[in-house]
């Protein structure tokens, strides 16, 4: 009898392992291959060799990049150097990046590890750059003021909070206020492993301001990119491992109400909102397994989606760019400016194409 119970228990454990392994492979799109979609006049951005995980384009074409992210379990082509914030002018004929000096002596640059970024422009046209950083595997939001004439960033403040143990991306709604996607990737390797493997949906979205901090949405399988509609009425949230983008209605008290969900056959990463049309541009991982288990002989591909009329009954989803990793590995973000598409990656290069 004891032997029978033991064999039954072993069988149940093996079945559970097999089911979770299958689910894990499905959530990571382990077996999907890329169907190439090309764009004209694509050129690699000069000066980016260790990733452009996130980017923000200002109305005048100046563009911020976060680069050099050290991400647990993810490839790094420059592991010994701290991260940087880069600047590029998309109005130049052959744009190239330069590193922004960080002023103020209040930030430890040796442990600077920039991740998601977001900008806020106030009534005086002062530009604030909010940067998620992971010094020593923790999470902070670093607040900077952009000094355009000096081409530098003035560090103003470091934000930490117990509800923000492992921030992924942010959407600024003020100089020190933002929505943040929050997972367990940096918080604890043990939690991270279980969350990734079992799909425990532990991720959430937090609203932060100096006066109030609260969880405004939860139950996500790896909450990732986040963006806000042009009219400020809706918040878009990418659920990476569920292959979904959620649309939430934003209220005057900063709470969120779920409105609709779109599903895809790719892992959706950062979300950029078209400043003219309001369309969503999404950097995606067609095969997420290759991101977490890097092989130079079989590198992760890249994919960019454009979502038009997302609030309608029948949104239009277009694969604008797709590539098998020969040119661009591990796309995380895409944004547009005057007929150009700028594409960034978690650890590789960045690409600029004509639309």
Swiss-Prot record:
Family stated for the protein in its record: Belongs to the paraoxonase family.
Additional information: The preferential association of PON1 with HDL is mediated in part by its signal peptide, by binding phospholipids directly, rather than binding apo AI. The retained signal peptide may allow transfer of the protein between phospholipid surfaces.
InterPro entries recorded: 6-blade_b-propeller_TolB-like, Arylesterase, Paraoxonase1, Serum_paraoxonase/arylesterase
Main location: secreted
Disulfide linkage: 42-353
Cofactor binding notes: Binds 2 calcium ions per subunit.
Catalytic function, reaction form: a phenyl acetate + H2O = a phenol + acetate + H(+); An aryl dialkyl phosphate + H2O = dialkyl phosphate + an aryl alcohol; an N-acyl-L-homoserine lactone + H2O = an N-acyl-L-homoserine + H(+)
Tissues in which the protein is found: Plasma. Associated with HDL.
Binding site for Ca(2+) 2: 54, 117, 169
Alphabetically ordered keywords of this record: Calcium, Disulfide bond, Glycoprotein, HDL, Hydrolase, Metal-binding, Secreted, Signal
EC number(s) from the headed UniProt entry: 3.1.1.2, 3.1.1.81, 3.1.8.1
Gene Ontology, cellular component aspect: extracellular space; high-density lipoprotein particle; spherical high-density lipoprotein particle
Compartments in which it is found: Secreted, Extracellular space
Protein name stated in the entry: Serum paraoxonase/arylesterase 1
Functional note: Hydrolyzes the toxic metabolites of a variety of organophosphorus insecticides. Capable of hydrolyzing a broad spectrum of organophosphate substrates and lactones, and a number of aromatic carboxylic acid esters. Mediates an enzymatic protection of low density lipoproteins against oxidative modification.
Binding sites annotated in the UniProt record for Ca(2+) 1: 53, 168, 224, 269-270
Domain of life: Eukaryota
Main enzyme class: hydrolase
Cofactors demanded by this protein: Ca(2+)
Active site per the UniProt annotation: 115 (proton acceptor)
């Amino acid at each position: 009898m004891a032997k029978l119970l033991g064999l039954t228990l072993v069988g149940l454990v093996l079945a559970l392992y097999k089911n979770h392994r299958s689910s894990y492979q499905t959530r990571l799109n382990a077996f999907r291959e890329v169907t190439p979609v090309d764009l004209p006049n694509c050129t690699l951005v000069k000066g980016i060799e260790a990733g452009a995980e996130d980017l923000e384009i200002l109305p005048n074409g100046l563009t911020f990049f976060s680069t050099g992210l050290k991400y647990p379990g993810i490839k790094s082509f420059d592991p010994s150097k701290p991260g940087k914030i880069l600047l590029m002018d998309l109005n130049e004929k052959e744009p190239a990046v330069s590193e922004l000096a960080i002023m103020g002596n209040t930030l430890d640059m040796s442990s600077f590890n920039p991740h998601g970024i977001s900008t806020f422009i106030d009534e005086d046209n002062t530009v604030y750059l909010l940067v998620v950083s992971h010094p020593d595997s923790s999470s902070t939001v670093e607040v900077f003021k952009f000094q355009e004439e000096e081409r530098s960033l003035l560090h103003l403040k470091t934000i930490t909070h117990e509800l923000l143990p492992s921030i992924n991306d942010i959407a600024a709604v003020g100089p020190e206020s933002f929505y943040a996607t929050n997972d367990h990737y940096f918080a604890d390797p043990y939690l991270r492993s279980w969350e990734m493997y079992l799909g425990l949906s532990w991720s959430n979205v937090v609203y932060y301001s100096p006066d109030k901090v609260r969880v405004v949405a939860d139950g996500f399988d790896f909450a990732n990119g986040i963006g806000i509609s042009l009219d400020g009425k809706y918040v878009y949230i990418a659920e990476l491992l569920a292959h979904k983008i959620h649309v939430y209605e934003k209220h005057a008290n900063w709470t969120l109400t779920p409105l609709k969900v779109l599903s895809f056959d790719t892992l959706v990463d950062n979300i950029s909102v078209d400043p003219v049309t309001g369309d969503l541009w999404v950097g995606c991982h067609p095969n997420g397994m290759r991101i977490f288990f890097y092989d130079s002989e079989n590198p992760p591909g890249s994919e960019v989606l454009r979502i038009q009329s997302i609030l309608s009954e029948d949104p239009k989803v277009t694969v604008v760019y797709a590539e098998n990793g020969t040119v661009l590995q591990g796309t995380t973000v895409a944004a547009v400016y005057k007929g150009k598409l700028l594409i960034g990656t978690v650890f590789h290069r960045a690409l600029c194409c004509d639309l």
